[in-house]
């Protein structure tokens, strides 16, 4: 019934698996037949505090009984408190704009870059934004154009001008010219193979751009909100970006996005806006998520989970050398590089048969994005099932 209903009335923009999940608790999901699954995907890095989190559910229910939405024409206390929390926890001297998704956050960042470029005092206006060829920044038209993967650009042109693609980090330095206003990049590419950028290279780029008055904008839609082991991967890299974009895990499943910038006065009233962005419900959820994850971080629980998960992935590479090359990633944004795209697909398919949810990334990487609240029992059960799946490949 569910599959027929979906195919009849919902646009076919997703390659769905028609399992029907009905309930979840932390990193465990149950389907309509009562079968349990270990979730190493978190709804693509969204369910940062797991499924059915009582604290998050309580905060959402409490807020929903009071106010959900009034619009940004009026003061929204949880919005201001969440902005304060993000700024103070990061240690960055920034202000925050709230949106509803990662794509919207990146659109906001691009508008900041373009206004910054337009405001440049010189004969040549700056408008070019450099991104990487294997990047992914969203599916709205401008964010899609910022995405450097040519395969993503079919059918939807003409696109906005002004985007330039670098082959790699070293190539960025060669592309910066007098018309460049910003560089937008991911420190770990979620759709590009989970390969972290070189730390010294990023620091060198930060200095290079600062000397030339070009903005460094970091897309932390997937790496942000403790997924990297720190609040932001930028902190782990020891850099201070001019702009950071956030979404996915910030509200644990409630739609939210955010743009943080050191350009605290870049927007004037009317320059940018969002009807739903920063509403009472999403920002209250964000406050609760940050409170939960901040405690895990401070206690050292998060780092212990990262270390154990990484050790399990490395062990798989040793145990199955015919399938895997190496482990990649940062924090609990991890991957194992398969020896071929065919093996990658087989691993994901066989894992699902054993009721473990994992994802793909790039040409041949199997991606792991478990809830940051993942228990040791769930981790052990998930890897036990995964080993059984791999024996059949």
Curated annotation (Swiss-Prot):
UniProt KW keywords: Amino-acid biosynthesis, Aminotransferase, Arginine biosynthesis, Cytoplasm, Pyridoxal phosphate, Transferase
Coiled-coil zones: none
Key word Transferase present: yes
GO biological process: L-arginine biosynthetic process
Name used for this protein in its record: Acetylornithine aminotransferase
Needed co-factor(s): pyridoxal 5'-phosphate
A Pfam family recorded for this sequence: Aminotran_3
Lineage: Bacteria, Pseudomonadati, Campylobacterota, Epsilonproteobacteria, Campylobacterales
PROSITE patterns (alphabetical): AA_TRANSFER_CLASS_3
Record text on subunit structure and interactions: Homodimer.
Organism: Wolinella succinogenes (strain ATCC 29543 / DSM 1740 / CCUG 13145 / JCM 31913 / LMG 7466 / NCTC 11488 / FDC 602W)
Gene3D superfamilies with a match to the protein in the record: Aspartate Aminotransferase, domain 1, Type I PLP-dependent aspartate aminotransferase-like (Major domain)
Pathway: Amino-acid biosynthesis; L-arginine biosynthesis; N(2)-acetyl-L-ornithine from L-glutamate: step 4/4
PANTHER family given in the database record: ACETYLORNITHINE AMINOTRANSFERASE, MITOCHONDRIAL, AMINOTRANSFERASE CLASS III
Binding site for N(2)-acetyl-L-ornithine: 139, 274
């Amino acid at each position: 019934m569910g599959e027929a209903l979906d195919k009849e009335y919902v646009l076919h923009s997703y390659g769905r698996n028609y399992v029907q999940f009905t309930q979840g608790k932390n990193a465990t999901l149950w389907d309509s037949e009562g079968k349990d699954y270990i979730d190493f995907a978190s709804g693509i890095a969204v369910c940062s505090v797991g499924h059915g989190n009582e604290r998050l559910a309580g905060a959402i229910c409490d807020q929903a009984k009071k106010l959900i939405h009034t619009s940004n024409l009026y003061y929204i206390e949880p919005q201001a408190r969440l902005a304060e929390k993000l700024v103070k926890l990061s240690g960055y001297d920034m202000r925050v704009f709230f949106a509803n998704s990662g794509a919207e956050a990146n659109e906001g960042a691009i508008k900041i870059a373009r206004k910054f470029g337009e405001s440049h005092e010189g004969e040549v206006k700056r408008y070019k934004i450099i991104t990487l060829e294997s990047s992914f920044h969203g599916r709205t038209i401008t964010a899609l154009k910022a995405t450097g993967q040519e395969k993503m650009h079919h059918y939807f042109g003409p696109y906005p001008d002004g985007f330039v693609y670098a082959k790699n980090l070293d190539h960025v330095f060669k592309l910066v010219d007098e018309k460049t206003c910003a560089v937008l990049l991911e420190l770990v590419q979620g759709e590009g193979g989970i390969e972290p950028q070189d730390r010294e290279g990023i620091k060198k780029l930060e200095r290079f751009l600062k000397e030339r008055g070009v903005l460094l904008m970091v897309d932390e839609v997937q790496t942000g909100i403790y997924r990297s082991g720190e609040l932001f991967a930028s902190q782990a890299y020891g850099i201070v970006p001019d702009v950071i974009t956030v979404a996915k895990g910030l509200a644990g499943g409630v739609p939210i996005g955010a743009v943080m910038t050191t350009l605290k006065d870049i927007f004037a009233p009317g320059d940018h806006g969002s009807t739903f962005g920063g509403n009472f419900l999403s920002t209250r959820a964000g406050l609760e998520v940050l409170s939960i994850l901040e405690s895990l971080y401070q206690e050292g629980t998060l780092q212990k989970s990262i270390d154990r998960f990484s050790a399990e992935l490395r062990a798989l590479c040793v145990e199955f050398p015919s399938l895997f090359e190496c482990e990649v990633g940062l924090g609990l944004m991890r991957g194992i590089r398969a020896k071929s795209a065919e093996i990658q697909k087989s691993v994901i398919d066989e894992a699902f048969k054993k009721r473990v949810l994992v994802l793909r990334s790039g040409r041949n990487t199997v991606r792991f994005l478990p809830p940051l609240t993942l228990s040791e029992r769930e981790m052990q059960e998930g890897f036990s099932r995964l080993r059984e799946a791999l024996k059949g490949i």
